[in-house]
Amino acid sequence: MQIIARKNKNYFLWEGFLNGDYCLCYTTEILEEYEEILCLKTNRLIATIVLEIITQAPNTKRIDAHYHWNLITQDPDDNKFVDCAVFANADFIVSDDKHFKELENIDFPRVLVIKLEEFARLYRNIDIN
């Protein structure tokens, strides 16, 4: 969520999302966490606007993660992102959270995690046109 701040060096990634350059997958649990974080860091109005953008954008996919893999043990709350990625058949999760490192040792289901800076590099090198 840090990329939505205009002053953030990776704001161009949010602009890319708004332009439809990549797909964002989410579950209800993920939206609830985003709302909580955005309300703490900004205010309720901004949180509502951002969530509305995410849920209404044509390049988002709402996922019903009806099974919980429970792959991350150090911070089980992070599993909502893993479950979403598995059911969405996502290419990867973008996160700098150290708890996702546990996934490197799990063969099935295989979930790739890349850091925000790596995603920014990949995004810069993709010809969107």
Model-derived features: where do they sit?
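PIN-domain endoribonuclease scaffold, especially VapC-family toxins
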Residues: 18-21, 25-68
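A structural micro-motif
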Residues: 22, 60, 91, 109-111
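Short, well-structured N-terminal submotif of metal-dependent ribonuclease cores
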Residues: 1-26
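Acidic, PIN/NYN-like endoribonuclease modules and their adjacent C-terminal/linker elements
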Residues: 98-129
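Active-site neighborhoods of divalent-metal-dependent phosphate/nucleic-acid chemistry enzymes
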Residues: 59-93, 98, 102
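Hydrophobic/aromatic ligand-binding patch that stacks against planar heteroaromatic rings
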Residues: 16, 54, 84, 105
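Short, flexible helix/strand-to-coil boundary loops that buttress conserved ligand/catalytic motifs
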Residues: 4, 38, 104-107
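A short acidic, often aromatic-flanked loop/helix-cap motif at beta-alpha or helix-coil junctions
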Residues: 32-33, 68-72, 118-124
